[in-house]
């Protein structure tokens, strides 16, 4: 069977259990991609959010919860559970959070996005198994639904797999 790519746009989330699918999102600058995979049910999801907190625009958050970390991550978890996933089994990885448009570091959207994800996941009792965050380059990431393997490619770089070690999280880069 042919593998199909499910493209996750900005302020978007896709959840699937189709083993022939790969979830992919492009051009992660300061945005964050949250990838989750349940190795038992094979339910996977990929969220691409723009901003850390919905309080800045509750109307937009109501229209599209995937725009913000604080509304997008819980909405993603609800969708994963509805598809048969178990939050306690989820392998979670992050990519993005770069400082690409704010060279002076005034707004630090990438860092704030990353910290929001960590806080929300921690409150949900979920550990981050791998991440490629920070820096000043954009990234593309893809999640293979059948295996839960995830790859990241930085602009101008080679694709590499985000791996999970036995102790839990393995950092590939830091914010």
Residue ranges and their predicted role:
Residues 1-31, 38-61, 65-91, 98-175:
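Short acidic-hydrophobic catalytic motif
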């Amino acid at each position: 069977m042919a593998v199909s790519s499910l493209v996750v746009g900005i302020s978007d989330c896709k959840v699937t259990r189709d083993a022939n699918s790969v979830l992919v999102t492009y051009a992660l600058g300061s945005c964050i991609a949250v990838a989750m995979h349940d190795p038992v049910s094979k339910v996977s999801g990929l969220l691409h959010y723009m901003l850390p907190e919905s309080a800045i625009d509750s109307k937009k958050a109501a229209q599209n919860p995937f725009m913000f970390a604080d509304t997008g991550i819980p909405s993603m978890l609800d969708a994963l559970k509805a598809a048969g996933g178990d939050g306690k089994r989820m392998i979670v990885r992050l990519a993005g959070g770069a400082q690409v448009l704010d060279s002076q570091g005034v707004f630090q959207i990438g860092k704030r996005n990353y910290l929001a994800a960590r806080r929300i996941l921690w409150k949900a009792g979920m550990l981050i198994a791998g991440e490629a965050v920070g820096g000043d380059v954009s990234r593309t990431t893809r999640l293979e639904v059948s295996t839960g393997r995830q790859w990241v490619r930085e602009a101008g770089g080679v694709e590499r797999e985000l791996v999970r070690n036995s102790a839990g999280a393995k950092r590939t880069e830091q914010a």
